[in-house]
């Protein structure tokens, strides 16, 4: 979560206080994670609109490369703390710029990544793969972003409920 990233990078900054370059890097990551946390808080405040079906997506031009880079920045503290390997790659991507709601995309991907990190044992791997497919119409592509880990996984019973609101495997 962004709060874990903020705490992790703050701890790293304090332990490297004499290394100005590292501290500056950690502060940039803290700022990025703080902005994401603010975005999540705003999303929580919008929950009543989501439940009533009145939420509006804010589609803007977004660089998928930037999205993946930002995610890597946010999650890298947790990856390092658990001694995990993080792999990110793109396959067959010829157009990185898409129109989407960047906040919602980041929210979904960060939740998936945070869960992957949380449930992957030390020394494990987490990967993110972006793949582009041809769309039905010319100039319209389809994208798949897959988050994969070698963590504990989900029980078959829980998989049937993953899209129910506020569900969590016990």
Go through the PLM ranges and name each one:
Residues 64, 153-161:
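Short helix N-cap motif at coil->helix boundaries in the Bergerat
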Residues 116-117:
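Short helix-loop "hinge" at the ATP-lid/N-box region of the Bergerat-fold HATPase_c
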Residues 77, 152-153:
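Glycine-rich G1-box
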Residues 58-63, 80, 85-96, 133:
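Conserved catalytic submotifs in the C-terminal HATPase_c
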Residues 14-21:
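Short acidic helix/loop segment immediately C-terminal to the autophosphorylated histidine
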Residues 69-81:
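Short alpha-helical segment within the cytosolic histidine kinase core of two-component systems
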Residues 48-59:
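Helix-loop junction within the histidine kinase core
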Residues 32-37:
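Short alpha-helical segment of the dimerization/phosphotransfer core of two-component systems
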């Amino acid at each position: 979560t962004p709060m874990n990233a903020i705490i992790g990078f703050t701890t790293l900054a304090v332990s490297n206080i004499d290394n100005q370059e590292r501290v500056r890097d950690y502060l940039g990551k803290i700022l990025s994670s703080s902005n994401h946390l603010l975005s999540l808080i705003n999303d929580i405040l919008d929950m009543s609109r989501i439940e009533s079906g009145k939420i509006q997506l804010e589609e803007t031009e977004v660089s998928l490369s930037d999205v993946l880079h930002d995610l890597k920045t946010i999650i890298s503290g947790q990856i390092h703390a658990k001694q995990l390997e993080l792999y990110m790659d793109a396959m067959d991507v010829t157009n990185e710029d898409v129109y989407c709601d960047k906040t919602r995309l980041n929210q979904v991907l960060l939740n998936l990544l945070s869960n992957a990190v949380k449930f992957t044992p030390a020394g494990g791997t987490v990967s993110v793969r972006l793949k582009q497919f041809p769309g039905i119409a010319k100039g319209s592509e389809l994208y798949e972003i897959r988050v994969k880990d070698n963590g504990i996984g989900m029980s078959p019973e829980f998989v049937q409920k993953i899209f129910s609101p506020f569900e969590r495997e016990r």
